[in-house]
Amino acid sequence: MSPPAGGAAVAADPASPVVLLAVHAAVRPLGAGQDAEAQPRKLQLIADPERPGRFRLGLLGTEPGAVSLEWPLEAICYTVRGPNQHELQPPPGGPGTFSVHFLDPEEAQQWAALVRDATAEGQNGSGSPAPAPAPAMCPISPPCSSMAQIPKATQPEVDLPQSSGNFKKEELATRLSQAIAGGDEKAAAQVAAVLAQHHVALNVQLMEAWFPPGPIRLQVTVEDATSVLSSSSSAHVSLKIHPHCSIAALQDQVFSEFGFPPAVQRWVIGRCLCMPERSLASYGVSQDGDPAFLYLLSAPREVSGQSLQNSKMDRKLGLFPQSLGLPHDLQPSSSSLPSPSQPGWSCPSCTFINASNRPGCEMCSTQRPCAWDPLAAAST
């Protein structure tokens, strides 16, 4: 069965364009008379892949053998007759006006708002003002004859209707996730293109199921980065963590359990200085007993007359050898600290204090600064 004039038949293509919204309704041709039975149809609004900045409205059959039609949005007239009742008029030469009945008034309102805003976006892109609505109707879309066609090269990018708000952005983000998980490269590229056109900020993360199971025990060696006696001024703790947790979450956990702010924490795992946004698993943490190193920096004093609370925090942060005012779980492994024989050099990357004769950092392998003079450091 060939489609009626004015509408293009829709092929069952699994890599279909981006669908902004799809709703179900009972559709009946008005020219068929009152006795004609309404048929279940699916209406969908999609971004036109061949004309950036434009949309298409599809009327899809839900039963075997039903003809599915699709028109450019600017070529149709869409009228709201009531909370549940709408009318769809295709361009001249088409199948005639359809009566569209929604079961859910909220769904009908959401659909009408999306069509209205998408139509407005198309008008802004074409540069043609929208004609005034007829007194007896509430047209959402202007008559097709009033729409001026413009060259494809001057058409704007696809724009998301404003009234749909974050709901549509979240729906597109969900579609992107589903397309990637299903291996649908074309659909993922289309959705990603729409999101990129609107500079939508996304937080792309792996699901927890892709990480090693947890919780596990992370063996942490705590060092005072301000002390030259790193080998003698260490403490050891065991933290219960999940491999999917980020370094930032680990810093917050240490702050919650021991009182050390994230700003003074430097984590080194697998000879790498850890970045807050990366996961523990990305540094190879996957099982009980995996090692990690935590270096604590001295917090700078804001003013000379700081509060008593800040003074207490300074004493807690000045771990070794200035004071031993540590939480009970972070007591140094050696209670008597020997006097320093000579100062070492501080790694510019992870702040680890290395022995003066080491050419590179013991923790992260960063090369020793060329300007560091062991003789001058020893004299001070």
From Swiss-Prot:
Residues 216-285 form the Ubiquitin-like domain. It is found in: Cytoplasm, Cytosol; Synapse. The modification Phosphoserine is found at S163, S307. Highly expressed in thymus and spleen. Present at high level in splenic B- and T-cells (at protein level). PROSITE patterns: ZF_RANBP2_1, ZF_RANBP2_2. GO terms for biological process: apoptotic nuclear changes; defense response to bacterium; epidermis development; keratinization; mitochondrion organization; negative regulation of inflammatory response; positive regulation of canonical NF-kappaB signal transduction; protein linear polyubiquitination. Transmembrane segments: none annotated. The keyword Metal-binding applies. Its main location: cytoplasm. The Ubiquitin-like domain is required for the interaction with RNF31. This is Sharpin. It comes from Mus musculus.
